[in-house]
């Protein structure tokens, strides 16, 4: 399976078919076989710390280790925060005050500030409302087009797949069963 620059490939399929495992293997979070390349450089034979920062991984539920939102950000990119509906005051918020949608939008900002060369998105809008979903989709598409990066997105939502995918791959029993444009 390969993904071109600026392409959004969506993986879908029944629960338990390995969609999230594919993302975790690419992000080198689990042992795997096969080769992974980014910008024509073979990653799997290099040290993970040499390339892992180039891959941005956003899980369905983001991790928050500190109490305040501001402790999670080394820098404040006004444009990214504004595009997702925040101003500087959000840095003073307690993480527990944030809704699930706000946490996902903040996690996306945190990820994009790292300027990844590829995005791995594991159902990033699965448990959030329509407004937050559309904001996240729009931001990812804009970033992807601006930086011409590949995006591998796991989704179960058929309408979302139609909106975001350049290509769609269905998995069943840990195998690719169908591909479409």
Predicted regions and their residues:
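Helix-to-loop junction immediately C-terminal to a conserved catalytic motif
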Residues: 27
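Catalytic Walker B motif of ABC-type/P-loop ATPase nucleotide-binding domains
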Residues: 119-123
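Conserved ABC ATPase signature
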Residues: 94-98, 102
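Conserved ABC transporter NBD signature motif
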Residues: 34-43, 51
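Q-loop/switch helix immediately C-terminal to the Walker
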Residues: 54, 61, 66-80
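H-loop/switch region of ABC-family ATPase nucleotide-binding domains
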Residues: 154-156
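Hydrophobic anchor residue at the start of the ABC signature
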Residues: 108
């Amino acid at each position: 399976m390969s993904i071109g620059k600026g392409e959004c490939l969506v993986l879908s399929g029944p629960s338990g078919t390995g969609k999230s495992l594919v993302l975790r293997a690419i992000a080198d979070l689990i042992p795997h076989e096969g080769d992974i390349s980014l910008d024509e450089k073979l990653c799997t034979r290099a040290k993970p710390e040499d390339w892992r920062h180039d891959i941005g991984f956003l899980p369905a539920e983001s991790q928050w280790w500190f109490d305040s939102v501001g402790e999670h950000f080394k820098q404040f990119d006004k444009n990214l925060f504004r595009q997702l509906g925040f101003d500087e005051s959000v840095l003073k918020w307690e993480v527990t005050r944030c809704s699930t949608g706000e946490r996902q939008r903040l996690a996306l900002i945190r990820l994009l500030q790292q300027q990844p060369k590829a995005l791995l998105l594991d159902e990033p809008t699965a448990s959030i409302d329509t407004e937050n979903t559309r904001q996240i989709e729009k931001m990812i598409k804009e970033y992807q087009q601006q930086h011409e990066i590949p995006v591998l997105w796991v989704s179960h939502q058929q309408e979302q797949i139609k909106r975001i995918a350049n290509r769609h791959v269905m998995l069943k029993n840990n195998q690719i069963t169908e591909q479409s444009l």
